[in-house]
């Protein structure tokens, strides 16, 4: 049987990405449906989440599915020593699809190999976050009218930021130029720079973050410095306030610039930026609903044509 799990965005072709964006567009037109009536979606969150969990659960509910799961592994048998495999096998008895976030890199891949139902990776450590990438791509497409030939600036925690790792891989199909802005301690890992070279992705690196640096940006993708990824809190304190985007820095940026952020924000975007029309991070979060509706349907074998026909009911 075909494994329809979504573990990494790197497994999606250009055609598949554009197909899912078309499906998300259909769900934005009509988000409330019964196309998943009778299905059960399990959300297993071994690591904290607000937006990802709520948007997946809302996506499932709005499509007629039922949701089961947990948000705190301490209240499950994993706190008694149950293995990830046993948890996955047990939940597979009750659900048609499992959406899982885990603190270990590679956990989603492992789950997809042992589970009899599809797995959607909702984030595995500092590794990948493919559903966030789909909503990021949808946000970029909506605001720029294209995914092709864009200047994309990634700012902040590029070492542990799984969202930027996934976005970089997805954009390989669209001839981007990436600009990595990070302190030395949080630079883009070497493996992703090698990936860029192997896939002929242009990139530049900076440590300065100012209005001159970002003047040519089409997309400015801000990230928070993730305290939970640091083993050395002194290192975290050194870098947590390094880059803060302020409204005055946007005065001479391109008119089409949009600011994205996977959220939650800590202090890397000043609150005065929220009122700037170039700020798009709250709309970006809303786009997560439509992107995740598309992901759930695709993984469960529902086609774009099914979605279009369903809208006529």
Curated annotation (Swiss-Prot):
Keywords for this protein: Pyrimidine biosynthesis, Transferase
Keyword Isomerase on entry: no
Gene name linked to the record: pyrB
A single BP term in Gene Ontology: amino acid metabolic process
Recorded catalytic activity of this chain's protein: carbamoyl phosphate + L-aspartate = N-carbamoyl-L-aspartate + phosphate + H(+)
Oligomer and partners: Heterododecamer (2C3:3R2) of six catalytic PyrB chains organized as two trimers (C3), and six regulatory PyrI chains organized as three dimers (R2).
Binding sites annotated in the UniProt record for L-aspartate: 80, 162, 224
Organism lineage string: Bacteria, Pseudomonadati, Bacteroidota, Bacteroidia, Bacteroidales
Pathway membership, UniProt: Pyrimidine metabolism; UMP biosynthesis via de novo pathway; (S)-dihydroorotate from bicarbonate: step 2/3
Name of the protein described by the UniProt record: Aspartate carbamoyltransferase catalytic subunit
EC code(s) of this entry: 2.1.3.2
UniProt organism field: Phocaeicola vulgatus (strain ATCC 8482 / DSM 1447 / JCM 5826 / CCUG 4940 / NBRC 14291 / NCTC 11154) (Bacteroides vulgatus)
Protein family membership: Belongs to the aspartate/ornithine carbamoyltransferase superfamily. ATCase family.
Keyword Transferase: yes
């Amino acid at each position: 049987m075909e494994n329809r799990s979504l573990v990494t965005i790197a497994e999606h072709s250009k055609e598949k990405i554009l197909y899912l964006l078309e499906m998300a567009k259909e769900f934005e037109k009509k988000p409330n449906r019964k196309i998943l009536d009778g299905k059960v979606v399990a959300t297993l969150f071994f690591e904290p989440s607000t937006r990802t969990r709520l948007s997946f659960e809302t996506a499932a509910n709005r499509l007629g599915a039922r949701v089961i799961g947990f948000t705190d592994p301490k209240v499950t048998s994993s706190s008694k020593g149950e293995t990830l495999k046993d948890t996955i096998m047990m939940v597979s008895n009750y659900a048609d699809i499992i959406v899982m976030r885990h603190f270990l890199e590679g956990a989603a891949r492992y789950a997809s190999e042992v589970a009899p139902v599809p797995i959607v990776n909702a984030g595995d450590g500092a590794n990948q976050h493919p559903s966030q990438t789909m909503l990021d791509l949808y946000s970029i497409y909506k605001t720029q009218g294209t995914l092709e030939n864009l200047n994309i600036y990634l700012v902040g925690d590029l070492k542990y930021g799984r969202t930027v790792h996934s976005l970089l891989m997805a954009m390989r199909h669209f001839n981007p130029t990436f600009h990595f802005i990070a302190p030395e301690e949080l630079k883009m890992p070497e493996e992703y720079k090698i990936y860029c070279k192997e896939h002929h992705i242009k990139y530049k690196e900076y440590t300065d973050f100012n209005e001159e640096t970002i003047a040519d940006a089409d997309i400015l993708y801000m990230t928070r410095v993730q305290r939970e990824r640091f083993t050395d809190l002194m290192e975290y304190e050194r870098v947590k306030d390094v880059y803060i985007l302020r409204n005055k820095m946007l005065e001479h940026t391109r008119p089409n610039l949009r600011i994205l952020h996977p959220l939650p924000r800590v202090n890397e975007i000043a609150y005065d930026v929220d009122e700037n029309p170039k700020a798009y991070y709250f709309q970006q979060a809303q786009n997560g609903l439509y992107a995740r509706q598309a992901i759930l349907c695709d993984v469960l074998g529902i086609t774009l044509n099914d979605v279009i026909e369903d809208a006529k009911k």
